[in-house]
């Protein structure tokens, strides 16, 4: 885990933002991301897909993002096509729909968030290596359990 303050993820990370189109590649594989333990069955869940260590958790540096409405459910599956290689996912759920992650006075999220590999940061933001998974063939399933904010 990097020693960067967890606040970097929350303040400088700027996870919430406009969605971007999926990457285009001729060598993509079907991947299913399953997200469970949603706190709200109506608030939008945003998924940010990263494929570089340098851009991980940096505002606007994700390869692409997706927004999903839970439609009354506490879990969902999102099929995506990803180029082969290393990937990591960061997830947020904007409970009050203000298009940002709300934080307490020390910068810890008060709204739900999660990372691939179900990494649970304590004092510092996770790094790409902790969250990465390998896309090396079809049928990959990435299961992520949302962590409620404080």
PLM regions with names:
Residues 46-50, 90:
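Beta-strand signatures of extracellular beta-sandwich domains
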Residues 6-27:
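Bacterial Sec-dependent signal peptides at the C-terminal "C-region" and cleavage site
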Residues 75-82:
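Exposed aromatic-hydrophobic patches
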Residues 85-91:
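A short tyrosine-centered beta-strand micro-motif
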Residues 29-37, 47, 144:
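A short, amphipathic beta-strand motif
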């Amino acid at each position: 885990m990097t020693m960067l303050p967890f606040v970097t993820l929350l303040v400088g990370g700027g996870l919430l933002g406009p969605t971007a189109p999926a990457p285009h590649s001729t060598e993509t594989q079907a991947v299913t991301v399953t997200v469970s333990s949603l706190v709200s069955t109506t608030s939008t869940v945003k998924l940010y897909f990263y494929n570089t260590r340098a851009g991980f958790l940096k505002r606007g540096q994700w390869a692409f993002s997706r927004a999903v409405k839970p439609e009354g459910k506490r879990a969902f599956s999102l099929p995506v096509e990803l180029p082969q290689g290393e990937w990591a996912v960061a997830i947020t759920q904007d409970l009050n729909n203000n298009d940002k992650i709300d934080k307490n006075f020390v910068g810890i999220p008060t709204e739900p968030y999660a990372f691939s590999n179900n990494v649970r940061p304590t004092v510092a933001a996770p790094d790409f290596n902790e969250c990465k998974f390998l896309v090396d063939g079809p049928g990959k399933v990435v299961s992520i359990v949302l962590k409620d904010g404080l």
